[in-house]
Amino acid sequence: NNCPQDWLPMNGLCYKIFDELKAWKDAEMFCRKYKPGCHLASIILYGESPEWAEGHSEVWLGLWDKKKDFSWEWTDR
């Protein structure tokens, strides 16, 4: 486990929920500045229920429509 203290290790990655309210773009920029390689979370498997989101009613995910043409992409890919 190479995750920082208070981060949740899962499937070889590290997850952390931040409680500050932010717009989606601001949240993604916050993640990128927080630590190199960080992004909003991606859900890899269809129907995956990420345990890092349990107990939180609203979280941002890293899925976006960069080109504004309904071709959705994950920010970490």
Swiss-Prot record:
Q: Which GO terms describe its molecular function?
A: carbohydrate binding; metal ion binding
**Major site of localization recorded for this protein:** secreted
The protein's matches in Gene3D superfamilies, at most eight in alphabetical order, are given as: Mannose-Binding Protein A, subunit A (3.10.100.10)
Q: In which tissues is it expressed?
A: Expressed by the venom gland.
Subunit description: Homodimer; disulfide-linked.
Q: Where in the cell is it found?
A: Secreted
> What InterPro entries does this protein map onto?
C-type_lectin-like, C-type_lectin-like/link_sf, CTDL_fold
Question: What is the protein name for this chain?
Answer: C-type lectin galatrox
